[in-house]
Amino acid sequence: MKVRASVKKRSEDDIIVRRKGRIYVINKKNRRHNQRQG
């Protein structure tokens, strides 16, 4: 999980989710794309 100031989709498999006021990018196929904002 990378922590970034701005999160973007890196592929079509990425899903953007809001949990507890934070924005996450989650990818089940390629877990290297997982990111969290802030």
Curated annotation (Swiss-Prot):
<dbReference type="GO" id="GO:0005840">
    <property type="term" value="C:ribosome"/>
</dbReference>
<dbReference type="GO" id="GO:0003735">
    <property type="term" value="F:structural constituent of ribosome"/>
</dbReference>
<dbReference type="InterPro" id="IPR052010">
    <property type="entry name" value="Ribosomal_LSU_bL36"/>
</dbReference>
<comment type="similarity">
    <text>Belongs to the bacterial ribosomal protein bL36 family.</text>
</comment>
<dbReference type="GO" id="GO:0006412">
    <property type="term" value="P:translation"/>
</dbReference>
<dbReference type="Pfam" id="PF00444">
    <property type="entry name" value="Ribosomal_L36"/>
</dbReference>
<keyword id="KW-0689">Ribosomal protein</keyword>
<dbReference type="InterPro" id="IPR035977">
    <property type="entry name" value="Ribosomal_bL36_sp"/>
</dbReference>
<dbReference type="InterPro" id="IPR000473">
    <property type="entry name" value="Ribosomal_bL36"/>
</dbReference>
<protein>
    <recommendedName>
        <fullName>Large ribosomal subunit protein bL36</fullName>
    </recommendedName>
</protein>
<keyword id="KW-0687">Ribonucleoprotein</keyword>
<dbReference type="GO" id="GO:1990904">
    <property type="term" value="C:ribonucleoprotein complex"/>
</dbReference>
